[in-house]
């Protein structure tokens, strides 16, 4: 589903320089972009939003966005981003329910490289490739995946509260953990 905002600025831009400036201005407020979704008759769909992921990479030939629980690992071309003509920016939009939350990362393919997601028939190798992507530098909401890579987090207005998630400031204010080491070398967290 196309982003109404991105469609408008692409169509209104006089040249590539103006388009790049407008995109830079828009992403300064953070990404992904969240927009109202509408029904075909023009009335607002209060239960869904258009979520547009933007990623800047000047030399990439392709960019795959891996969105946890959304990207179809059997049909990865559906998650290939499109380059915005005349820019270094890539985009892909989805229409999602307002209670949606997901982590995501970007996997660029450079000139002459084979996309790391191609030809991997075994699920473990494919999943490792998808987990190795880059986080969203324009999104302050992050989570680390199972291999320790930071991924962006998108959460819409009605997403359930995650009481166990802490901000970096809250993490920094936690006391240092205390460990007990047994004679045989095992460690146990105290408290």
Where are each of the predicted segments found?
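Extracellular Ig-like/FN3 beta-sandwich strand-entry sites
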Residues: 99-103
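Aromatic-rich carbohydrate-binding modules that target alpha-glucans
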Residues: 45-47, 52-98, 109-182
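A short loop-to-beta-strand scaffold at the N-terminal edge of the catalytic core in hydrolase folds
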Residues: 183-191
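Non-catalytic, glycine-rich low-complexity segments
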Residues: 1-55
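Acidic/His metal-coordination segments adjacent to aromatic residues that form catalytic metal sites
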Residues: 106
């Amino acid at each position: 589903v196309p982003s109404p905002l991105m469609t408008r600025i692409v169509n209104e831009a006089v040249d590539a320089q103006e388009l790049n400036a407008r995109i830079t201005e828009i992403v300064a407020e953070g990404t992904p972009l969240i927009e109202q979704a509408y029904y075909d008759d023009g009335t607002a769909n209060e239960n869904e939003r258009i979520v547009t992921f933007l990623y800047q990479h000047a030399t990439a030939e392709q960019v795959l966005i891996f969105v946890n629980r959304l990207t179809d690992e059997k049909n990865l071309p559906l998650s290939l981003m499109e380059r915005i003509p005349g820019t270094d920016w890539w985009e892909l939009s989805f229409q999602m329910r307002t209670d949606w939350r997901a982590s995501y990362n970007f996997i660029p393919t450079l000139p002459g490289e084979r996309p790391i997601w191609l030809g991997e028939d075994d699920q473990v190798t494919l999943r490792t490739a998808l987990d190795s992507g880059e986080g969203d530098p324009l999104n302050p909401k992050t989570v680390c995946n199972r291999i320790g890579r930071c991924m962006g987090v998108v959460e819409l207005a009605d997403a359930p509260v995650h009481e166990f998630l802490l901000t970096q400031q809250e993490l920094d204010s936690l006391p240092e953990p205390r460990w007990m080491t047994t004679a045989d070398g095992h460690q146990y967290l105290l408290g």
